[in-house]
Each structure stands twice: as C-alpha cells, then as structure tokens.
Amino acid sequence: SNPKTIKIWHYEEDNGAQGKAWAKAMEIFEKKTGVKVEFEKKSFEQIRQNAAQILNSDEAPDVMEYNKGNATAGLLASQGLLSNLNDYVKKYNWDKKVSGSLAATGKYNDKGVMGSGDWYGITNYGEDVVMYYNKDMFDKYGIEIPKTFDDLEAAMQKFVDNGVTPLSEGVAEYPLQHLWWQLVLSKANDKFIKNYEMYDGDVDWQGEATTYATKTIKDWVSKGYISKDCTGTKAEDAGQGFMNGTYPMFFSGTWWFGRFQSDMKNANWTFSTFPDTDKVVGSSGNIWVIPENSKKKDLAAQFIDITLSDEVQDLMGNSGGLPIAADPDKITDEKTKELITSFNGVLEKNALGFYPDWPTSTFYDELNSSLQELVNGTSGVKDVLNQMKDNYDKGVEAAGVKS
C-alpha cells in the first residue's frame, strides 16, 4: 500500500449534506498532509452485506462510514475487525464533541453491545424525529400550532371535526413505530431505555410506558387522528401525503428536512420536537470506523478529526445536514439554523432516546406487523404487547447479547 495515499469509503450522496461536507474534509486533509485520498463511494447495501469479508481482506479501506448499532458496528467490533479508538479519542478530545447519548453508538463492549466499553466509531452528525406541521392548513381552520401534549390532541380533534385526518402515517415501514416509541419515551426513564436498548435488565412489556403508548395509538385510530387505512402505507408515501397537503401533520425524522425545504417551497411549514417529553426519538448518525487491517490508522484518525472541525461542520449545516458541532451563527438559512438550534438543545439535555427496532435484527419488521394488527383492530393492546415481547425476547436470545 502506497504511503502517499489513504483509502476512504462512504455511502452518502455527493449532493447531500454529509457528501458535501466530507468532500471538503478530504480536500483539507490532502492539503494538510500531502497524502492523496483514494475515495470510493459504495452503496449502503454493498457495505452492509459484505463488511466482514471486506475487512478481513487486503481490500479493506483505511477509514469508512459504517452503520451504528449492535447488529452492525457492534458485531464487527466483537469480531476484532475494527480498531479500538480509545487513544485517538484522548489525543483529539473527541469525547468533548461526541458525548452523552451521542457517544452511545460509538462505544461497544466485548459482546458488541453499544453504550459501554471501548470506542470503535466516531460520528459527526445526528438525527432526531420531530413533528412537522403544515402551517397553511392550521391557519385555514384557525388552529394553533401545539405547544403541549394537550394542545396536540385538541388540534387533532379540531382537524377531525373539519373532516381532515391530521396525521400522515404508515405502518408498512417506519413512521408509526417512531410515533409509538416517542409515546413510550414520554413515560420512560433512563433505566427502561438501558434495559430495552442495552439489555441491562428485563423490559416490563406490560408496564406503564409501553401500555400507554400502545393504548394511545389505538385511541388515536378510533378518534380518526390516524387513518385505519395506513397499514400498507410506506414511509415515502406518508412523507408525500404531508408534502402534497393531504395531511397537516407528520411525525418523522430530520432526514426529510432538506426535501421539505426544496419540495414544499410554496407551503408554509414548521416543526418542533414532540411536546411534554424528556426524551426524543433519535441518535447519532452513522460512524467513522478504522478497520483493524489498516496500515494508516494515524492518518485515518487525522481525517476523522477534520470531519469534526468547525469548517466542515458549518458546511454540513449550511448544506441542510445536522452537524453535532456547528455554530448556529455560521448557518445562513433561517430554517436550518432553527433545526440546528433545536438539535443542540436536545443534545444539551442528553435527550436522545434511540430507535425501537435496534435491539434485534428482525425487530423492525416484527414491530410493524404488531402495530398493523393494532391499527386495523385485529389485536388488542395486551396481545400486541405480548407479541412484541415474544419477538423481542427471541431476537435478543438469538443474538446472544444479554449477559
């Protein structure tokens, strides 16, 4: 391998916020070090399916983007395929920028479970799930943008009274499971989250948080806040339903933000984190990892550090991304500045509550099928929770992650 080059892989689009920011980071790296970057863009699926083989071979890159979480980065770390980054974290003070719940997805124990143990990955952006509001539709019916949970339910009721289904939902993929998890988080404490996500103890599936969330979804369906017909709706179609003005509200991720900015130019829309909750759905973005086989670990670490620099972080913010260390005053677009300020507030409160499907590799689909039964009324609250519990327990046992 040529000492004058470093091999970097990621799977972001060139015109997206991460793609633009990281291209800038590569340019700065080359200027600073005199080392040439050999960049290869891979597809997410290419890396997901072949990571272990690639990292075991001479073809491995020196630094690459990899998916956060137990079944992905955690698994590779536990197999000895990723470099332990503890010394670099100390050297560059990365834990000052990547801290609290953001750091959870960069640290893995010897079983590959996130949240404790050694550093194997470093993120430089984040994501959370927010409630998007079409202000034109709120104004049309004289409804205020909700500030509290009670306001939220009152607003949805007013839309229903006017013949409008308020929430754009879908249970074929993710939007509804994120809403369900947000309702869980609004009643959950840190211990519950640790038990659920990091297998620290048993999850009380018939307890207050999960029962409340599941009952609330059922209740909202019966009141017409969520359509019974959304069980087969995919995420893209739920997003389109908000973009084209069919539905006034959409609870989904900040990854839609850039699209709403470009595709809803004629609509007046706004957003906020979910009301009356200490925890929100969200996490760090994906992580930079350094393969154990890399011969250029010091250079790889230097590149990672550049992606956390002010210049790269501010560019990411100005490109519509969600950097973890940007200065809101350097962000020119007002709406993006609002987004970054909101996310910085979430980080300050250490409020990221992760995602509901993370604990097992099959739980995403299993949660959806349980929630489909809840929405179309074929199963009641207790049965749905028992089904979730069985699937969760099976998946956790199969993964062998619980001590």
Predicted regions and their residues:
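Extracytoplasmic/periplasmic substrate-binding proteins
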Residues: 11, 18, 24-25, 71-74, ...
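Glycine-centered hinge/linker elements that transmit conformational signals in sensory
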Residues: 156-158, 198-230
